Swiss-Prot record:
The gene is slc39a9. The keyword Transmembrane applies. The keyword Lipid metabolism does not apply. Pfam families: Zip. This is Zinc transporter ZIP9.
Length: 310
């Protein structure tokens, strides 16, 4: 199968899978309590996904070239043990000034990509909320901007995923494409579920939720196709040099972390800052069952990622 048909197939699968996962909370009628519980579970899924799936995948993609280099140096000696390959990679990294330098660069690259993603969402959030605050009263403005930022953050994140998949497809390595695709699907399905349950909890009508979901589901496939089609041969080579797949995934992890921790979690926990002032429970904070759901949500992506070996 050529690169174009494989990326088309992966894009369609991503669109359908993501949309179907997002319609599950819409298809079932939940009571207020169950909806809150599902929202908490969705928030946990978002956090666990960012920490247990996206960041490790991005780091793996960035270091893959060095690990591969260690692997190939033993190519003639037959089968190489994984531990030997790892030792190789370490010796490649530590041996000689040039490799030391590239090691430092990779470390910086990981941090910079994550921070840029987080700061980008922070700025988008501030710009978005300043527009909303000027028109409405503070409380409804906070809720509205929260809905917008959550959707926007996840769309930006999905777009970065799409770029990662497009860049991976342009390498012509089927294994890389499949790994990136599985990684993206592992967190896009829970993210779609989390987004829809959060928007339902925030009181959006169902038609608008479906529109939000469609935009989110379309972002990654569209960007994957555009990235793949827009890359010339020379830029493909340049991309594999700077390891664009890993950088794009880490950038999207930064946006994901912002959405999960700054928006969804405080919203679910009863408006974050407000419950400290109000004192007592008064419906604020999380019940024991909700805490269990949150922890469970964080652990599910971890279990899934452990199950999916490279």
């Amino acid at each position: 199968m050529d690169d174009f048909s494989s990326i088309s197939l992966l894009s369609v699968a991503m669109l359908v899978g993501c949309y179907v996962a997002g319609t599950i909370p819409l298809a079932v009628n939940f009571s207020e309590e169950k909806l809150k519980l599902i929202t908490v579970l969705g928030a946990g899924l978002l956090c666990g996904t960012a920490l247990a799936v996206i960041i490790p995948e991005g780091v793996h993609a960035i270091y893959e070239e060095i690990l591969e280099g260690g692997h190939h140096s033993h190519g003639q000696a037959g089968v190489v043990e994984v531990s030997e390959a790892k030792g190789d990679a370490e010796s490649v990294l530590s041996g000689g000034g040039k490799h030391e330098h590239s090691h430092e660069q990779l470390h910086a690259c990981i941090g910079v990509s994550l921070v840029l993603g987080f700061v980008f969402m922070l700025l988008v959030d501030q710009i978005g909320s300043s527009h909303v605050h000027s028109t409405e009263d503070p409380e409804s403005a906070r809720v509205t901007s929260s809905k917008i930022t959550t959707t926007l953050g996840l769309v930006v994140h999905a777009a970065a995923d799409g770029v990662a998949l497009g860049a991976a497809a342009s390498t012509s390595q089927t294994s890389v494409q499949l790994i990136v695709f599985v990684a993206i699907m592992l967190h896009k399905a829970p993210a779609a579920f989390g987004l829809v349950s959060f928007l339902m909890h925030a009181g959006l009508e169902r038609n608008r939720i479906r529109k939000h979901l469609l935009v989110f589901a379309l972002a990654a496939p569209v960007l994957a196709m555009l990235t793949f089609l827009g890359l010339s041969q020379s830029s493909k080579e340049a991309l594999s040099d700077i390891n664009a797949t890993g950088v794009a995934m880490l950038f999207s992890a930064g946006t994901f972390l912002y959405v999960a921790t700054v928006h969804v979690l405080p919203e679910v926990g009863g408006g974050g800052h407000s419950h400290a002032a109000s004192g007592g429970n008064g419906g604020k904070g999380l019940s024991k069952v909700e805490v269990v759901a949150l922890v469970l949500g964080c652990l599910i992506p971890l279990v899934l990622s452990v199950g999916h070996h490279h």
